[in-house]
């Protein structure tokens, strides 16, 4: 059961324990479900049924139950592939905060120029420039920087109303210089607005925050809603909050800003109507791998559930699975092989894709990193070759404006064997296929970094025998041959 086009309404929460078709509506702080002015429309609720799981993945039912685009001009809305100052905090244990000297911050009063820096703050000029250089070298569009703004010392767990102003940088983050440096390299910075769930505070600062983005050249923001809501007693999925999430998107559109909301309500297809809602988290993403880990089957289920309502900023691309290598105090492990991390860029649809690991880990595996560099984030066509929720998904997508295809497979605990018929390719063309696959001894827990790369010629008559190990997968780039001289050095791939 799914819901679409939630506007001016509450979110429906299914009973996923008893597996019966009963549900509850998310109330407000007073226990009321909604305040509706008549005449009004309630959201669509649907049930999708098929005897072939691929049909559900290919369905556009939820998008089509939403209204067409509200914007006359969408030329400013662009797909984004990005890296960011984030994983070293989430997984590496580094702080968003600038100092340990201020246990209680007062906006406008606390003087950060008089405190002692903790020396561990990653959102600093030198580190951000390193990320900008890496992005420019490898063709990424943007660099996210979290922890750039004052207020992180006491941001969580205090039910604090005036928590951030979304405008004042820490002393070690030169917002003007860094934006100019990024733009000189052909890269943009991505803004970060963590609200600490203080919605009133975000809305009182929103216009100035968006204007600041315009002033410095930002065109995308990652927003966050961690914690208990303010106004106190409101819920993440109630009517009032759903109206806020949409308000943040429509106000951003006035400034030509794209929004990637984390911890917000699960999307219901509104990205068709408001396409600057370029991404959402709204499910267990890769960050949970740094906490307790996601089960291997997790990413074989999400495309049937969460992603039916809109693209997900899953933040894949982790190459170092042992979190103790980044943070000695961590016992967490990413439940995936390296090849599977590549496949997620195809199976987890989003026009906003992050290469989430730190640059140093990519530099250790540059041959595998090539797939992340090559894979598009905008597509003309999608095909679902094999699918069984909880077990495996094999997706193929055609790059926007080209004849190139990309294939991704993610598997659960059982692994998966495939014979991929490439009959969706053009009959009169030849292609170079580069296969990134699990090594023979690969395993998501014991040997996740074992992978192999092979390359050869394929056509529409080709059939590739593929294997994904437990918690593994594979990724394939299929590039149209335009220079026939390359044929001399390659054999047909099987």
Please state what every model-predicted region is.
Residues 2-6:
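Short, small-residue-biased leader/transition segments that mark boundaries at the very start
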Residues 147-333, 337:
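Aromatic- and carboxylate-enriched substrate-binding clefts and catalytic-loop regions
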Residues 357-406, 410, 443-447:
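Glycan-recognition and catalytic regions of carbohydrate-active enzymes
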Residues 388-431, 474-477:
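Carbohydrate-binding surface patches
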Residues 435-461:
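Solvent-exposed beta-strand/loop surfaces of large extracellular or lumenal domains
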Residues 455-493:
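C-terminal beta-strand-rich structural cap/linker in extracellular carbohydrate-active enzymes
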